[in-house]
Curated annotation (Swiss-Prot):
Glycans are attached at residue 190. It is a multi-pass membrane protein. Disulfide bonds: none annotated. This is Protein unc-93 homolog A. Keywords: Cell membrane, Glycoprotein, Membrane, Transmembrane, Transmembrane helix. The chain crosses the membrane at residues 8-28, 42-62, 69-89, 90-110, 140-160, 202-222, 258-275, 286-306, 321-341, 345-365, 390-410, 412-432. Belongs to the unc-93 family. It is found in: Cell membrane. GO terms for cellular component: plasma membrane.
Length: 458
């Protein structure tokens, strides 16, 4: 196995273990800690911290520590959050959620920088296009990473599975499910009893163990990017001054392409929050019961994982524009269905089909967005990925902010609007890229013609 691919698999498996723990724990926050809104407050604090972290920390940590040790250090923040859940209260969850948020942006920026650099080095080595290898590496990563949703939800479903004591769902409650949910209908009663402390400790022990294994895997087996560059004969760049690094995230906004593309990560945050927050609560839990949430999310994660690998493979044949068109078409269709559909207990397959379709489209945003930012901003990868996480965090914060007081139908219309803006911005950037490429090609042809003319005269 080639060394670059081995490194990609190490990063992927590390993230798989880490987010098997974090993803499962995140989905249970609002259910386990509903008293005085502690769970929702924890998630809101977490993503606000991610937003602040995205502005400053990623370029600094990556420049000072390198991609490998930035990933290791950031993973430690996730494990601390898991430990904080063993004695859950305002004094443990809020500080540890802030710490996790501070580590999240550097973690993802380092991952994006690492995979992009590895892809470009491998492309030079084998004589392929850099964007094709980068797309392939992101496809492999998200195939492995997205399966964490399967394992995380499966673990929680198995641990809490014996507790399911389903009650009949009243017809009055079904009438307020779906897009009609305006937080004024009857409260969902078809939930399980609160799990015992022993079961919670069992689950947290498994999740914490997964996080520790992730740290050890990356620390021991991942090759340092700086060592890799030296081995490939690349010169290690001299670190820029601290203030230059601090400002690099914001200075990149002078590139109009970034301004146009920021709606893509913004929409990514919106759509992820909708599925995990609104779909699971207003559709699945409301109509089927909370014990079905894990299984529906497994379907989503499995489809996202499989499609991530598929898109990474076929992008060099179809081009990224076709994949973005596919992703947008699927989400447009799903949003329309969500607006018109009245969920019912007799329509069980529909819940899984819609979850799977949402996963097909989510795979486009996850693989292509990361590859797009890595390819377009190759010279400024760290600030580019920091801005990507900033946009995604803003999407999460806004969506969590209005989640408690807007009807689901209104949230769907907002989602539709942001998706439209994202596609317009992306389409404009593609047009600018084609236009710039044609200018370069025209200039090369002109120079070639002039050279031939000079040779003829001689």
């Amino acid at each position: 196995m080639e060394r670059s691919l081995k490194n990609v698999l190490v990063v992927s498996c590390g993230f798989l273990l880490l987010f098997t723990a974090y993803g499962g724990l995140q989905n249970l926050q609002s259910s386990l800690y509903s008293e005085q809104g502690l769970g929702v407050a924890t998630l809101s604090t977490l993503y606000a911290s991610v937003l602040l972290s995205s502005m400053f920390l990623p370029p600094i940590l990556i420049k000072k520590c390198g991609c490998k040790w930035t990933i290791v250090g950031s993973m430690c923040c996730y494990v601390v959050f898991s430990l904080g859940n063993f004695h859950a209260n305002w004094y443990t969850l809020i500080p540890t959620s802030i710490l996790l948020g501070l580590g999240a942006a550097p973690l993802w920026s380092a991952q994006g920088t690492y995979l992009t650099t590895m892809g470009n080095l491998q492309a030079e080595k084998v004589g392929k296009l850099g964007k094709d290898v980068v797309n392939q590496y992101f496809g492999i990563f998200f195939l492995v990473f997205q399966s964490s949703g399967v394992w995380g939800n499966l673990i929680s479903s198995l641990v809490f599975g014996k507790m399911s004591m389903q009650e009949a769902i009243p017809e009055e409650q079904l009438m307020s499910c779906g897009a009609k949910d305006c937080l004024m209908g009857p409260a969902a009663t078809n939930s399980t009893h609160h799990p015992s402390q022993q079961l919670i400790y069992t689950l947290l022990g498994i999740y914490t163990g997964c996080g520790v294994l992730a740290i050890l895997l990356v620390a021991v087996f991942l090759e340092s990017l700086e060592d890799k560059l030296e081995n490939e004969g690349e010169r290690r760049p001299r670190p820029p001054p601290l203030w230059s690094t601090l400002l690099s995230t914001f200075m990149l906004f002078r590139d109009k392409r970034l301004c146009l593309l920021m709606f893509l990560p913004l929409y990514s945050g919106f759509q992820q929050e909708f599925l995990s927050g609104e779909y699971t609560k207003s559709y699945v839990t409301c109509a089927l019961g909370i014990h079905f949430v894990g299984y529906v999310m497994i379907c989503f994660s499995a489809m996202t994982a499989l499609c991530s690998l598929l898109y990474g493979k076929i992008s060099k044949y179809t081009g990224r524009a076709a994949l973005y068109a596919l992703g947008a078409a699927i989400h447009f269709s799903c949003i329309v269905v969500f607006l018109l559909w009245h969920p019912n207990t007799n329509q069980l397959p529909v819940f899984f089909v819609l979850s799977g379709l949402w996963g097909m489209s989510d795979a486009v945003w996850q693989t292509q967005n990361n590859a797009l930012f890595g390819v377009l901003f190759e010279e400024n990868k760290e600030p580019a990925f920091a801005n990507y996480r900033l946009g995604e965090a803003i999407g999460f914060v806004i969506a969590f902010g209005y989640s408690s007081f807007l009807c689901v139908s209104t949230k769907l219309y907002i989602l539709l609007g942001v998706l439209s803006l994202a596609m317009v911005g992306y389409g404009t950037v593609e047009y600018l890229e084609v236009k710039a490429a044609s200018k370069v090609l025209g200039a090369e042809k002109k120079n070639q013609a002039e050279e031939e003319e000079m040779k003829t005269k001689i």
